[in-house]
Amino acid sequence: MQTALLKPKIIAVEPLGDHHAKVVMEPFERGYGHTLGNALRRVLLSSMVGYAPTEVTIAGVVHEYSTIDGVQEDVVNLLLNLKGVVFKLHNRDEVTVSLRKDGEGIVTAADIELPHDVEIINPNHVIAHLSAGGKLDMQIKVEQGRGYVPGNVRKFGDESSKVIGRIVLDASFSPVRRVSYAVESARVEQRTDLDKLVMNIETDGVISPEEAIRQSARILVDQLSVFAALEGTESAAEAASSRAPQIDPILLRPVDDLELTVRSANCLKAENIYYIGDLIQRTENELLKTPNLGRKSLNEIKEVLASRGLTLGMKLENWPPAGLDK
């Protein structure tokens, strides 16, 4: 009797529009379509890294319930429009940008002054309408994050939010706008009881639907890897004789699994950093002393580690473990 579980062999991506695609995977054993589809959907909606405006300072405005002379929108609607601007930061976690415009006309996202490593995905997005003599002068803080973070959460923990005139925003960081899935019937040879998983994904353009699927799958694999390494319960005598700290299996993976750029990966290997466990024990200052590894590569490494719940400068006991090849 065959006991091996089927793995999907067909993965098709059908574009449905800008930043919108249908991803089809088959065949799955019966029931696995719903099991994996629901898990992927929840991760896609909650755990993708994105960018959002988190704080705003507007010249002449003390609080969000104000109005601005010469601006059609009140401050509440102005902030709602601002939340619709899709930012993408390269090799940085936060940035403060400026928006200054006067005179009659429409204010769009393209009017925001950006540094070279920040881009706006939807530059035609309308922020406000100015009448003759109207003027708008704003400072906008944009940060990287996950999921949805209410503004009042940061108000209690951030002293900077107490500055008069600084408005703290609710931040929706997720780059995934909508996700749905359906499970249909699939057939392989004589078997007709198999599942086909169809996922419909729409993003804001910061990442593609295909990349969103890849990232969500990696997150699930990382979270489940600890269960794959689970061992049976030890007896009291065995527990007493094996008190060495257990090592997270993620740390035993080669740095190649982080999918860094070729430049960053080669710099790490030149310093004999072959495993993720080797990497996280290095500090930022130590890595910056590595030949050809600059601030851009360092930020890339920090971002990739953060997506896996890791940071630089961590301390590990019992490293390297016995039998680890270099």
Swiss-Prot record:
One of its GO terms (molecular function) is DNA binding. The N-terminal domain is essential for RNAP assembly and basal transcription, whereas the C-terminal domain is involved in interaction with transcriptional regulators and with upstream promoter elements. Residues 247-326 are annotated as: Alpha C-terminal domain (alpha-CTD). The lineage of its organism: Bacteria, Pseudomonadati, Pseudomonadota, Betaproteobacteria, Burkholderiales. It catalyses: RNA(n) + a ribonucleoside 5'-triphosphate = RNA(n+1) + diphosphate. GO terms for biological process: DNA-templated transcription. DNA-dependent RNA polymerase catalyzes the transcription of DNA into RNA using the four ribonucleoside triphosphates as substrates. Keywords: DNA-directed RNA polymerase, Nucleotidyltransferase, Transcription, Transferase. Belongs to the RNA polymerase alpha chain family. One of its GO terms (cellular component) is DNA-directed RNA polymerase complex. Homodimer. The RNAP catalytic core consists of 2 alpha, 1 beta, 1 beta' and 1 omega subunit. When a sigma factor is associated with the core the holoenzyme is formed, which can initiate transcription. It comes from Cupriavidus pinatubonensis (strain JMP 134 / LMG 1197) (Cupriavidus necator (strain JMP 134)). HAMAP family: RNApol_bact_RpoA. Its EC number is 2.7.7.6. This is DNA-directed RNA polymerase subunit alpha. It comes from the Bacteria. Residues 1-231 are annotated as: Alpha N-terminal domain (alpha-NTD).
